[in-house]
Amino acid sequence: GMQVRGDAEEIELSRWDKLVELNITAVFELSQLAARQMIPRGGGKIINVASMLSFFGGFRCSPYAASKGAVAQLTKACSNEWAGKGINVNAIAPGYMDTPLNTTIINDPERNREITLRIPAHRWGLPEDLKGTVIYLASGAADYVSGAIIPIDGGYLGR
């Protein structure tokens, strides 16, 4: 995915369009392609990447929050359509993750400290923190799980 930060009234529409194309249109197209292959085979698993910003609006990142909210709703809508065809559609919703998308915030000592103090786990997530949930959702253990948006955020949303 990508991020566009700034005051909502100042964000150029071209930046909005690029972010929406990558963060939601591509997810929809890939889901369609996957479903077209899975339906004749009797099912499968689709795991989307939403965000903790699927649950709240964030600050100075309105295009990103809107697109990740759309991923969550698309996940639920596709689950409603495809669960009866054997396709489980779910999403993980990472919280603050130590990835290049957040380099600016991570490198700002004050902002980094503020965020870390709000995370009950007292640390940023790492990409490897996502794998257990993804493995679960892809496994037979999750055959009755569909339409779920699962936060992986060190407890942030539980506050």
What are these regions (language model features)?
Residues R36, N80-G84, D143:
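Alpha-helical segment proximal to the catalytic Tyr-Lys
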Residues D7-A8, E12-D17, R111, I115:
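Substrate-binding pocket helix/loop in short-chain dehydrogenase/reductase
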Residues E9, F56-S62, G84-K85, H122, ...:
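Active-site loop immediately N-terminal to the catalytic Tyr-X3-Lys motif
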Residues S31, S67, T75:
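Active-site helix of classical SDR
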Residues F28-S31, G43, R123-I152, Y156-L157:
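C-terminal substrate-recognition "lid" of short-chain dehydrogenase/reductases
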Residues S51:
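Residue(s) in the substrate-gating loop at a strand-loop-helix junction
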Residues F55, A72, A93-T104:
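Short, flexible catalytic-loop segment of classical short-chain dehydrogenase/reductase
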